[in-house]
Amino acid sequence: MRINLNPANAGLDLDVSIGENKNLGRIAQIIGPVLDVAFPPGKMPNIYNALVVKGRDTLGQEINVTCEVQQLLGNNRVRAVAMSATEGLKRGMDVVDMGNPLSVPVGGATLGRIFNVLGEPVDNLGPVDNRTKAPIHKSAPAFIQLDTKLSIFETGIKVVDLLAPYRRGGKIGLFGGAGVGKTVLIMELINNIAKAHGGVSVFGGVGERTREGNDLYMEMKESGVINEQNLAESKVALVYGQMNEPPGARMRVGLTALTMAEYFRDVNEQDVLLFIDNIFRFVQAGSEVSALLGRMPSAVGYQPTLSTEMGTLQERITSTKKGSITSIQAVYVPADDLTDPAPATTFAHLDATTVLSRGLAAKGIYPAVDPLDSTSTMLQPRIVGEEHYETAQQVKQTLQRYKELQDIIAILGLDELSEEDRLTVARARKIERFLSQPFFVAEVFTGSPGKYVGLAETIRGFKLILSGEFDSLPEQAFYLVGNIDEATAKATNLEMESKLKK
């Protein structure tokens, strides 16, 4: 059966096919991004069903608004949250119950493309092959499907792998302000997982600035993470729900990105990186929706369902026996208050934290990961082994001692330190520089070829520095190199250059 959704404009080609399972309702009330829709008795949609409003507004512009059912109010009414702006809607408009939750395209067709919350491409590169679709709402994997083996997710980035290793299928919080290299670190991780693990990445921009989303897309094209000539060779799919969009879109865009990632894990059996920037905006959007739905606010004005909403999202991000989703989530901390319910609820789910330091970025040490503030639950001898654990602890102790001595050095100078402390400072400065490394995605800016450093090579390099074997080498030799052999080769080159100058 085909019906015209706007009898007042009978000549318009806005027909929607309605099968046996699709019911028709009418808008009864509009409160901003929230709609109340009346349905015939016995024809009520289920919670989370998608509703579609089609028609023309008073100016004759075409309207196509998708909503999601949130509450069944009684009296044959449902309350739904719109995924796009509700301007132009009016009471009495026809609404179609699609009979299922929102479904989005998944699989290889999503690579190199930008989508909105509904899975519609927004990059002007034409339609997407959407023969393979998946609903955004689903249960977390059952216990029996989970892979409980603790294993390190090697990133090829020295500072991360040594001091705050990521767990395969774990969740990592990425803390960093503007301009400290968060985007470059994200792009390098996307590049490395594709090369070393044969994996792909999904980036979910949740409530971020449109400008930042555009900049990220442009930088990904420039660095080769997105291949414009052959989109199938791209390593990432992007899903954006920007700050200017209604709270419904910002609340669900994380689930859209997660659904795409789950397909790569479960069907393609790949290791997937899922980036969520920013997880706080997901909570913030949920808070707005909760208030619009008339729920009583909880602590600090947040939604009473905060823990449930966060848990529903986070529990789907996990390792199964087929593949893994490793999630890196940027975390905004309101007013730097770590006890705020939003970041506090997020911390309960994190396996590791990567903290970016403005001080290190100012020194030109990239990636600017703070080696003392970054933490990981994986850094235990029974998981990473004694050698890795001992090396990491010695590196941290050396850097901590250097940090303590910096005030004395600033006031009295290096000469006033004991011989032992001077040796510690010299080694700490070498370690600090050896924690930097050239990135593949930054080759176009730096001119230095990127380096992927395996975990065994990383441990060997830091052990040799700590043992004092390279005390005679200049600290500049350790700056922006890959493994320790490159540092010794660079030291030889520096020595030859200085001799030639003389």
From Swiss-Prot:
Membrane topology recorded in Swiss-Prot or TrEMBL: Peripheral membrane protein
Reaction(s) the record says it catalyses: ATP + H2O + 4 H(+)(in) = ADP + phosphate + 5 H(+)(out)
Binding site for ATP: G176, G177, A178, G179, V180, G181, K182, T183
A GO biological process held by the record: proton motive force-driven mitochondrial ATP synthesis
EC category name: translocase
InterPro entries from the UniProt entry: AAA+_ATPase, ATP-synt_VA_C, ATP_synth_F1_bsu, ATPase_a/bsu_AS, ATPase_alpha/beta_chains, ATPase_F1/V1/A1_a/bsu_N, ATPase_F1/V1/A1_a/bsu_N_sf, ATPase_F1/V1/A1_a/bsu_nucl-bd
The keyword Thylakoid is annotated on this UniProt entry: yes
Key word Cell division present: no
Subunit (UniProt): F-type ATPases have 2 components, CF(1) - the catalytic core - and CF(0) - the membrane proton channel. CF(1) has five subunits: alpha(3), beta(3), gamma(1), delta(1), epsilon(1). CF(0) has four main subunits: a(1), b(1), b'(1) and c(9-12).
Protein name, per record: ATP synthase subunit beta, chloroplastic
